[in-house]
Structure formats: structure tokens, C-alpha cells
From Swiss-Prot:
This is Heme A synthase. Interacts with CtaB. The keyword Oxidoreductase applies. GO terms for molecular function: metal ion binding; oxidoreductase activity, acting on NAD(P)H, heme protein as acceptor.
């Protein structure tokens, strides 16, 4: 009974975090992230309702660089759209946090979760708290002298969300999934760890690309212009200033994509070699997800970052990570 409660709670929490990640990505892609220029964790629970209230919020927005440099011709109706998108993102963050924290407190005091097993849940709780601050810290960077947020802060904001999901999903499969009765698979465990690491790096690079609008600089594949290494960075490939260069970031994200494919291709081969029915099914599922991820990534580049495809690309990255976390769980406990 208690096990089922924990499983349902973790499943819902995982879904909510995924929604947060996707809506956060859409917020970034639509340029809505800087539309709310204040951080009001308690008083900001309701959007403006009256015309006067909307005018007040619009006036606040006009005082900051994004309006003055980019959206100076935006109408009130257009402002309402981006404002409500950012509002939904923040509201969903509050709801997700409550969905996680309230049952956790109840489970702890009722003894449903034993004290010796609380550590990962406490870490996730702390990350939820840090995430709220990190979100505002990111937004604040776009309200100073720049009309866009720091791509580094954006990347860390995303990675914290992914780590939260990772912790919750791992606890979910520990509660729900059966172990495999197979011999120890150290090689598969090692490749699972490598794959998780490479996917994390690729997600981080993807956030840097999004933060710099780097998906727009080259729109052909597999080359960038007429070269594999774009001409702009050929002479200074290892310069630290490249971390602020959209061309370099798109190049690194492409390299990351090749790395993710290579590592997971090896993992798929290893899964087939075990000749276990469930691992074979996982291998086929991994192939499908990997191909979808590659296809959506290429389409995102070639068609100048269409919002729907880019959002699917981000979602599939989380699914890919989930499969590898599942593999890690199976091989760690084999």
C-alpha cells in the first residue's frame, strides 16, 4: 500500500518536472522569459485581470532593456501572451514544488519513508529550493544591461531541473521496477555511466546554444557552411572567449550529438550481445529514441529552430536520459 503511494507520488512529480522543463524551453524559445520583471513568490500567484493592472505590468516591462532594444514595437496583446507564458512557467514551478514537498513531509512523519532512505529525497528538496532562486538569478541577468539572460545561468537552471528529475526517476524505478536475474554486467554499467555523463554535457551545451540563439547561425547539416569546423573559429578553437560565441557553441553541440550517438550505439550493441529479452526490447527502444533525437536535432538546425520541433528535441533528450538511467539501475543491481 505504502509502496504504491510512493510510486504514484514519484511518477506525478517526474511528470511535473518534465512539464516544467518543456514549458521552460518554450518560454525561452518565444522570448517570454523576461516579461515578468519582478520575483514575487507569494504575491505573484495571480495574473493581472483588469486593463489597468495589465497597463501597470506593461509599464514595468518597458523600463527594461529587452523592451527598449528588441520589443519596442510590441503591443499590449502581444505582451499579454509572453507574460502569461512566463506566468504559467512560474506557477507550474510552485505547483510542482508543492506536489513534491507536501507528500514528502506527510510520508516522513507517518514513517512511510524510513529515515535511512531520506537522503535522495532531501537532496531533491534542496534542489527545488535552489531552483527557485536560480530561476530568478537567471532572469535578473537579462534585466540589467543586456536584453537577454546569461546563457550560463540558463544552462545551470536547466541542469538543476534535470538533476531533480534524475533523482526522482531513479527513486521511482527503485520502487517500481523488478531486478533482472542476469550475471553481472560491468561493461554495460560502465557504458551506462558514460552515456549519462555525455547526455548531461549535451543537455548543458543545448542550453548554452538556446541562450545564445546559436541555433540560428548555421542552418545546414552536416557541414557548417562549407566546412566541418566553421571558418570563424578555425584559428582560435581553444580560446576561452569562444564560450560566448554562438558559432562555437553550435559546433560543440553538434560534436556532442555525434558523441551521444557513438556512445549509445556501443551500448545498444552490448545490450543485444547479452541476449536477454528485456534488454533486447530496451535496445530497440533506445534505437528508436536515439533516431528521433537525431532527426529532431537536424530539423531544428535546418529549419532555424521551429518551436514545436525544438521542444520535441528537448523532450526526447529527457526520454533518452530516462532509458539510460533505467539501464544503469538494472546493471548496478544485476
Amino acid at each position: 500500500m505504502h509502496q504504491n503511494l510512493i510510486t504514484r507520488w514519484l511518477f506525478i512529480s517526474c511528470i511535473m518536472v518534465i512539464l516544467m522543463i518543456i514549458i521552460g524551453g518554450i518560454t525561452r524559445l518565444t522570448g517570454a522569459g523576461l516579461s515578468i520583471v519582478e520575483w514575487s513568490p507569494v504575491t505573484g500567484l495571480l495574473p493581472p485581470f483588469s486593463f489597468e493592472s495589465w497597463q501597470v505590468e506593461f509599464a514595468k516591462y518597458k523600463a527594461f532593456p529587452e523592451y527598449q532594444s528588441v520589443n519596442y514595437d510590441i503591443t499590449l496583446s502581444q505582451f499579454k501572451f509572453i507574460y502569461l507564458l512566463e506566468f504559467i512557467h512560474r506557477l507550474l514551478g510552485r505547483i510542482t514544488t508543492l506536489i513534491y514537498i507536501v507528500p514528502l513531509i506527510c510520508f516522513y512523519f507517518q514513517g512511510v519513508i524510513k529515515k535511512c532512505k531520506m537522503l535522495p529525497y532531501i537532496i531533491a528538496l534542496l534542489l527545488f529550493c535552489i531552483q527557485g532562486f536560480m530561476g530568478w538569478y537567471m532572469v535578473e541577468s537579462g534585466l540589467l544591461n543586456n536584453h537577454s539572460v546569461s546563457h550560463f545561468r540558463l544552462a545551470f537552471h536547466l541542469i538543476i531541473a534535470v538533476i531533480i528529475y534524475h533523482i526522482l526517476f531513479y527513486q521511482l524505478i527503485k520502487n517500481y521496477c523488478d531486478l533482472l536475474l542476469i550475471p553481472s554486467q560491468k561493461l554495460l554499467l560502465i557504458f551506462s555511466c558514460i552515456s549519462i555523463t555525455v547526455i548531461y554535457i549535451q543537455i548543458f551545451l543545448g542550453a548554452l546554444v538556446a541562450g545564445l540563439d546559436a541555433g540560428l547561425v548555421y542552418n545546414n547539416f552536416p557541414l557548417m557552411g562549407d566546412n566541418f569546423i566553421p571558418i570563424e573559429i578555425q584559428d582560435n578553437l581553444f580560446n576561452l572567449t569562444n564560450l560566448y560565441d554562438p558559432v562555437f557553441m553550435q559546433f560543440m553541440h553538434r560534436l556532442g550529438g555525434f558523441s551521444v550517438f557513438a556512445v549509445n550505439a556501443i551500448l545498444v550493441i552490448c545490450l543485444f550481445k547479452v541476449k536477454h529479452l528485456q534488454l533486447t526490447k530496451i535496445a530497440y527502444f533506445l534505437i528508436i529514441v536515439l533516431l528521433i533525437q537525431i532527426a529532431t536535432g537536424i530539423i531544428t538546425i535546418v529549419y532555424s529552430v521551429p518551436i514545436i520541433i525544438a521542444s520535441i528535441h528537448q523532450f526526447v533528450a529527457i526520454i533518452l536520459l530516462s532509458i539510460i538511467i533505467w539501464c544503469y539501475f538494472l546493471f548496478k543491481n544485476s
